[in-house]
Amino acid sequence: DFKLKEVAYSVILLVMMVPMQVTSAGFVSFMSDLKLTNTYWPLIIPSIAAPAVVYFMRSYMKSSFPLDIVEAARIDGCGEFRTFLSIAIPMMKPAIAVQAIFAFIASWNNFYTPNMILISVDLKKKTLPMMVSALQSSDKFNDYGAIYLAIALSIIPIIIAYVLLSRFIIAGVALGGVKE
């Protein structure tokens, strides 16, 4: 707990309301200053601490994380860091899994930000939506069967991510169903 907790949360909610297109010029300039253009880091890191993730995780903790467990851990002599790693993180796995799936899908389908950050003409530094767009807009390549096959194959990583992370969601639902 800290004094301006609610103010900080309100600022995070206000940031959620600002469209990405409004801040994109500043974001690209900042990434250029950090020499991170033409890398994938500006596409990965912002989704970890996105305002929607903070909002969802806070809501999940307030509704599903009993503070009695933290107090019991403190009484047992467990430090804050160990309480976080041993108790909070395992209880938060369903929410972390949901946010990981949402962040992965949003990043995977994002066209706008990679189109500004990955500015080299090298085709090795493109995301899948950029490649599909290049295929669809090409005058020389009009094999629509291959284009639609590429689009269909682009779903496979999303399915793999869901299959790998869904067990945490199911375990969380089962854990939440057991009440005293």
Regions found by a protein language model. Name each.
Residues 1-180:
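A structural signal for multi-pass alpha-helical bundles of membrane permease subunits
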